Amino acid sequence: MKFFRYFFTLIFLLSFNLFSQENKISKRIYTTKKLVKKPVIDGFINDEAWNVVEWSSDFTQKDPDEGKPPTYQTKFKVMYDAKYLYVAIRAFDDEPEKIERRLSRRDGFQGDRVNVIIDSYHDKRTAFVFTTTAAGVKGEEFASQNGENWDDSWNPIWYTNAKIDDKGWTAEMKIPFSQLRFGKAEEQIWGFNINRTIFRLQERSLWQRIPNDQAGFISEAGELHGLKNLISQKQLEIQPFTVLQYDKYPPEAGNPFRTGKDFRANFGLDAKIGITNDLTLDLTVNPDFGQVEADPGAIALDGFQIFFREQRPFF
């Protein structure tokens, strides 16, 4: 009897394992190539420079009907050179006049948008997320804990543009490698995914399907292949400032400090310097936060503290 019990248990476990493998979503792979000619980042994707790589499409819904084809498809291309990663996106829409195109501040994600998710370390835990809306508003987030935490205070330097046409809307991105972190392998493999949101339909679709019951998000992304001989770019950002103040008023006789006019000058800088691929030096000289956006007024009527986002650049 024990033999048959062990035998049927083994058959059950093997069957369950085979069932799990059959239902596992296979990883999608996009193979990029090094560009021959640099594209102009103007939002139009008809530049000949994009012809060196192929389109990839076949997005699937994430919300509201996970796994089903989206209402409108999306396709993209990726290529690179020594310093930048380039992404072109075509977001189809049969009703372009209904595309939600909202102008907002940076990181304002209201409206139709696409998110390019790059796990450049391929640690399947963290990712850099670059977002552009149909209005060309850009935003960025740093995702950690396998997609459990999203930090939108990260503000790298990169370039994007978007245009609306009779087929929907298009976008181009130019992302400096200096804003990413990656290993030293001769040929890189990065985690990669693209998320599209159609605002009026409250619909999200992904290039690499990730079922809603799947644990993890970054770890389930597709893969970007073909990145060869990348050289880590040292990050160097310098943001100087100068503040001039001139006051004019009636002079006071006998007062050498009230001559009728005052002139003041103040200057300083913020800097971000890449020491190594894993270490960045942030420094400030004579910081002046007079131009920083003030926190909005708020009154707490409950027992919870109010959290305000840090607006000062250095912090």
Give the positions of each predicted feature.
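Sec-dependent signal peptide recognition
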Residues: K2-L10
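Hydrophobic h-region of N-terminal signal peptides that target proteins for export
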Residues: L10-S20
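Structural preference for beta-rich elements and adjacent junctions enriched in aromatics
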Residues: Q21-F315
